């Protein structure tokens, strides 16, 4: 929700000012979900204005996470869907448990990823796999995710946080200023300077279409959508 996204952005801002912190681990509460992404009821009930507000919040929060001056690690302990996967994509390193499921299912409900998914995913897995994941809605398991470069390590269930913390502790052996400069240089190698802003306008424009409304309503009604391509 908006509170969580703004909270993440605020935390990153505080950590960037703390000279004692150079690693960050993000994981989900409980045992089932890393993050299920946005609540579609917000888009259904709030319309275009809510869509713009929420997509902007996703964009700003994950851009801030991607620009964290230290090392960020996602400990994926369950389902990472939509915005949940985009949160992991904004991290520097991803560790996933065997039970994890990763997907960007937005087109199934007439939407598109609005937290950097279409921009960041191709850099990790290549254009072909990015298209397969986004355009088909395929759910990726850890073995395949590791093979295509979507995650850096697969671990047993219940071990993602410990593994992520171990990686984070190794950061203490590195020069903080070197880490920051290396990240900056790697980011500069990207073609687009503003990847998180690329999705904002197309995402909001979808709310002018009948298919967007039908997709969300069908999901909430637990039925198959009747696409009109309009």
Labelled PLM ranges:
Residues 217-230:
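Terminal low-complexity tails and localization/encapsulation signals of metabolic enzymes
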Residues 95-100, 142, 151-198, 204, ...:
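C-terminal long alpha-helix characteristic of the crotonase
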Residues 45-56:
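A short acidic, glycine-rich active-site loop
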Residues 138-144:
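Acidic, divalent-metal-coordinating active-site segment for phosphoryl/phosphodiester hydrolysis
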Residues 1-27, 49, 63, 151:
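Conserved CoA-thioester-binding segment of acyl-CoA-metabolizing enzymes
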Residues 61, 65-67, 75, 81-135, ...:
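CoA-thioester-processing core
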């Amino acid at each position: 929700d908006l509170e969580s996204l703004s909270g993440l952005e605020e935390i990153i801002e505080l950590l960037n000012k703390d000279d004692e912190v150079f690693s960050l681990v993000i994981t989900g509460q409980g045992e089932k979900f890393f993050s299920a992404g946005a609540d579609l009821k917000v888009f259904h009930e709030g319309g275009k204005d809510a869509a713009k507000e929420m997509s902007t919040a996703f964009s700003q929060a994950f851009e801030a996470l991607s620009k964290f001056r230290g090392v960020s690690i996602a400990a994926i302990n369950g389902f990472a869907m939509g915005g949940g996967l985009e949160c992991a994509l904004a991290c520097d390193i991803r560790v996933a448990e065997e039970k994890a499921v990763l997907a960007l299912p937005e087109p199934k409900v007439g939407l598109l990823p609005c937290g950097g998914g279409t921009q960041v995913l191709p850099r990790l897995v290549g254009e072909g796999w990015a298209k397969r994941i986004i355009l088909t809605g395929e759910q990726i398991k850890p073995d395949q995710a590791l093979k295509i470069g979507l995650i850096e390590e697969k671990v047993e269930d219940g071990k993602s946080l410990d593994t992520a913390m171990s990686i984070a502790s190794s950061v203490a052996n590195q020069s903080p200023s070197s880490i920051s400069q290396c990240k900056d240089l790697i980011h500069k190698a990207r073609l687009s300077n503003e990847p998180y802003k690329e999705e904002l306008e197309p995402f909001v424009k979808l709310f002018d279409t009948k298919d967007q409304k039908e997709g969300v309503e069908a999901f909430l009604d637990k039925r198959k959508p009747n696409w009109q391509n309009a």
